[in-house]
Amino acid sequence: MHGRRHLAASLTRALIQAPSRSISSTPSLLQTLDPSVPSPPAAGAGRLAELRRRLQADAPSLGDFTYSVEVGTRQRPLPKPKWMKETVPGGAKYAAIKAKLRELKLHTVCEEARCPNLGECWSGGETGTATATIMILGDTCTRGCRFCNVKTSRTPPPPDPDEPSNVAQAIASWGLEYIVITSVDRDDLPDQGSGHFAETVQKLKALKPEMLIEALVPDFRGDPSCVEKVATSGLHVFAHNIETVEELQRNVRDYRANFKQSIDVLEMAKEYAPPGTLTKTSIMLGCGETPDQVIRTMEKVRAADVDVITFGQYMRPSKRHMPVSEYVTPEAFEKYRALGVEMGFRYVASGPMVRSSYKAGEFYIKAMIEAERAKGTAADSSA
């Protein structure tokens, strides 16, 4: 534990461009005092007049006020450091995938969340293997997390009953070996959309039995029956993101989400899913967390027997969303990766541009799944 405290201290030194966390000034109720109210004693009248003058001079505009309520600060956005430069999307594979998605009326979290890796993943990047994360259950979420760019509504359109078949058709036409399926939250549906999710996985498995499937799911409000339905649908990786450290959950996520509920979902998935199924979660950095908080959160996630964890830099989608608190250095990301391996996570992806569905980790996860399959085959043979 002493070593981890030392690591936390070194991580703090590795972080750069962290703005001060001062709270913006707000106008005082003294400005609205009724003139008929008797004045204070003469001795304090001068100080009160000066206070009123200073408050009025420093009073924020309406825009400043709404901004401070929205994000808790009046500071200007931080400039992006050199390591956060993005690649412009392009290439033949990128165009082909985009055209196919439009044709089949499918949505990807890559586009909806404005993922910085969209161009690399869709075009194939260094490996030449194009990857996309399909988003099912529509493109409108019933929740409003402060970091997310997906549009929201209390009453989104009903799910498309043909979507599971369309997803299977799209994936088959791409010839992929590993696919990630995710979804918006659907608190408006009786089963939170878990049945639709499970059906999509099952149709994919029927069409391509050898395909490796990762499902990045919402919390289903912690409903065990919903978690079980998806965990037993035939997937290989059950992923659910805790998004941020325990202490910042209410600041970052929708009020219906919380740390304990997410940990419970990951634990239930491990219990319900067949042996060899991996569980996975992701944490954004740069939301105002401290290294100590990150380490404590990692310990609790590992205690839930989660196999894979990823770390990436939070990037503000628009001015309507919470601001970036700090840009975490690549060196700090590497220290979190090393610590995760030391803690016993089977795989850790950690870097400024890493996202929970980023393809760089899928090759390692694929190898882990195939190793589990080999174990199962060997066990069956010996029996």
Curated annotation (Swiss-Prot):
Classification via InterPro entries: Aldolase_TIM, Elp3/MiaA/NifB-like_rSAM, LIAS_N, Lipoyl_synth, Lipoyl_synth_mt, rSAM
Record's compositionally biased regions (Polar residues): 25-34
Keywords from the named record: 4Fe-4S, Iron, Iron-sulfur, Metal-binding, Mitochondrion, S-adenosyl-L-methionine, Transferase
Extra information: This protein may be expected to contain an N-terminal transit peptide but none has been predicted.
Identification of the protein by name: Lipoyl synthase, mitochondrial
Protein's UniProt keywords contain Transmembrane helix: no
Cofactor or coenzyme needed: [4Fe-4S] cluster
Cysteines joined through disulfide linkages: none
SUPFAM superfamilies to which the protein is assigned, alphabetical: Radical SAM enzymes (SSF102114)
GO function term, MF aspect, one: metal ion binding
Lineage: Eukaryota, Viridiplantae, Streptophyta, Embryophyta, Tracheophyta
Biological process (GO), any one: lipoate biosynthetic process
Organism expressing this protein natively: Zea mays
Gene3D superfamilies xrefs: Aldolase class I (3.20.20.70)
Residues covered by the Radical SAM core domain: 126-346
SMART domains reported in the protein's UniProt record: Elp3
Co-factor binding details: Binds 2 [4Fe-4S] clusters per subunit. One cluster is coordinated with 3 cysteines and an exchangeable S-adenosyl-L-methionine.
Entry's Gene Ontology cellular component terms: mitochondrial matrix; mitochondrion
